């Protein structure tokens, strides 16, 4: 059976993929600056004699052509960029700079290279083509740039996986509908009237107004939104003042809105703006409200969900495949591709409680159980095989 062959190849290449992951992990590069990562990817593809082209600067798009060409093509994607976080893990392959793969993109690149090794080995049995997209700048919405370079031309379906620390390594999760939230960001500038800290009565204190705005924002989700609809409004930055005895002129709050559709995000943004303007007016302050559109929600295609479930069960067993009813409220620019083609976004378990590998994404102690690398490589390979056979 093909799944037996896939798992056997993944096991054989396991140490090779771990080595690649550790090399990438120790040299994390920020969005659109993934030069060393891109070079490593190309070197590994060259070893396999897999054709590829450059996309979006540091990105790479490889193609594996099956012998039995049905005319169908599935694209598998991994993101490449790191975050500006100082790593606190004590690992032999710890980051050597001030950046960190705290979102697991080092693992994503590694397991997609593992997938390339597997599929290249069995390409005589592929009933179509597989494209492998190593995408730069996910943290900065890199898919917007990539998609303009026609990477989806000739592609019929898409799939990807993301490190998920709350799921144990060796298991995966598949969302039944929405996998990742739609997003936006906002910035509130409260304009008061500065003065001496001893004379607040002669000032319009923007810090006091900012506190009132912050408190009012906490009422949006609990009092303005249907409790069965997932919505998050978070203020993540609150800045004002530079001196101990001067009431400043302005206060700036920054944050994000998350919901299961961009329409809901826009609705919540309007509620937020009305609250901000009303509170500021009540305190005699002026304000500026600025928002920037974020990504759309990641919505899994129904047919791809079922295909992914069946493929995962072949590789992992039914007991290690979790169907998830509620979305994660994080965002992902894979949504851009899924607006164009049917796709599947999977949560790849990377946690291991016994090894204390349970820190969340974007944490300076985030790590993975490297067992997940062969799991993901096998799963993505099986998914590609099954898609090309079925459709």
Where are these regions (language model features)?
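Acidic/His- and Gly-rich active-site-bordering loop/insert found
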Residues: 2-101, 106, 110-126
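Hydrophobic face of alpha-helices
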Residues: 17-21, 38-42, 112, 207, ...
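Divalent metal-coordination and catalytic microenvironments
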Residues: 24, 62, 76, 105, ...
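Short acidic loop-to-helix transition motifs that present clustered carboxylates
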Residues: 55-61, 139, 328-331
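Non-cysteine beta-strand/loop elements that form the S-adenosyl-L-methionine
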Residues: 75-77, 186, 345-350
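Histidine/acidic-residue-rich, glycine-tolerant segments that coordinate divalent metal ions
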Residues: 83-85, 90-100, 107, 122-248, ...
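Metal-dependent amide/peptide-bond hydrolase catalytic core
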Residues: 211-391
